[in-house]
Amino acid sequence: QIAQGEIFGIIGRSGAGKSTLLRLFNRLENADSGEITIHGEHTRHYSRSQLRDLRRRVAMIFQHFNLMATKTVAQNVELPLKMAGVPRAERQKRVDEILALVGLSALRDSWPAKLSGGQKQRTGIARALVTQPEILLCDEATSALDPENTHAVLKLLKEINQRLGLTIVLITHEMDVIRTLCDRVAVLEHGEIIEQGEVWRVFGHPGHAVTRSLLGTLHHDRAEERLSLSENQQLVTLHFDGSSGQEPDLQRIAALLGADARLLYGSCEQIQGRVIGQLRIRLAKPLANPHLQQHAGWVADRLTLSGDTAAENAGA
């Protein structure tokens, strides 16, 4: 269930069914079973006229823009209104408003061939918004863009969501898009949702192996650090999954682990205002497990030790 006004992300491996699921929302694909409801309305048995209205209310943008090369920016944006029979004066007024919203007023008479990738996607967004939809579907909308244009398009989508109260549903292979933009995320595998929740929860403590594989760098394991330990050394991993809201405090960590602690590596970032990641620390002398576990909550959300396989698997 996707709430009105939220930004909802869908991730999964290639072939998981992400694009098919997205296209079910506006009935570009037909469901073999089950039901999809939009604002409480079942859409499975819609007539042609009802489908036209549905696709006006549920707009879509694509990875490859799909602009008409022989029409200007303004003409591309105007096209859905023209096809719907909207009067010319009303069309022009609406196009002017939308071009101003997406920052393309100065390029209204430009041809698609003269636009950058980011400008083309902004045109696609404007064309989708011109019918005043309630929901915007984004099918890999930033995959063809460079990092700078990706950031600009994500910022625009966030502004549109906040200003218009628009519900946005997106699919992507880019975890940074989910981190930056989404309120909640679902993980799809073989056409089934295997995990979903707030972004910080799913990224901070993924419960499924597929999710951990997709997140990759946030939940890696480096066996070579274990192999490099001498007989008397100990490896401590501090996990931050966002559940307590605390941040790494080096002073507290040093107080708990002692002066003979060395930071091997760490990876932490903020997602929805919560710190997600881990720190791995080598101790010159091992500390008693009960002592560390008793005080673990003082410095991290979880703590695991080298060789503590059961604890590490439970926390993975």
Task: State what each model feature region is.
Residues 26:
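Helix-to-loop junction immediately C-terminal to a conserved catalytic motif
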Residues 196-197, 205:
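ABC ATPase "signature
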